[in-house]
């Protein structure tokens, strides 16, 4: 099980997957040039959604397709410091009609 974590520090935002820095995956799709964000709907939160989904699914097209709904239902509602498990992400994918 992969654990994704985000926190706000004095040095900025930190997002990890099992303790390793999560890449923005701009090579797949660039929604923003400002990196990750969360707690609201927008381009930087969608970049985070894309990065998490691609890390979990290893499927560029599905990650792009699901990034907006995942951002709206999950990423926009995260607290300043948060944790998501791969099981929670899998549940989102299973429950999303666009995932097929």
Task: List the model feature ranges, each with a label.
Residues 1, 94-100:
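Short intrinsically disordered terminal tails
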Residues 1-15:
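Glycine-rich short-loop/terminal segments
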Residues 11-69:
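Amphipathic alpha-helical packing elements
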Residues 58-96:
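Short, compact, well-ordered microdomains
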């Amino acid at each position: 099980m992969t654990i994704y974590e985000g926190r706000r520090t004095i040095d900025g935002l930190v997002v990890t997957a099992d303790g390793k820095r999560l890449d923005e995956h701009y090579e797949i799709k660039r929604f923003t040039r400002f990196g990750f964000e969360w707690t609201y709907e927008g381009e930087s939160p969608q970049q985070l959604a894309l990065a998490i989904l691609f890390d979990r699914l290893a499927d560029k097209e599905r990650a792009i397709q699901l990034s907006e709904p995942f951002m709206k239902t999950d990423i926009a509602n995260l607290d300043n410091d948060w944790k998501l498990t791969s099981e929670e992400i899998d549940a989102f994918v299973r429950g999303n009609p666009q995932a097929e």
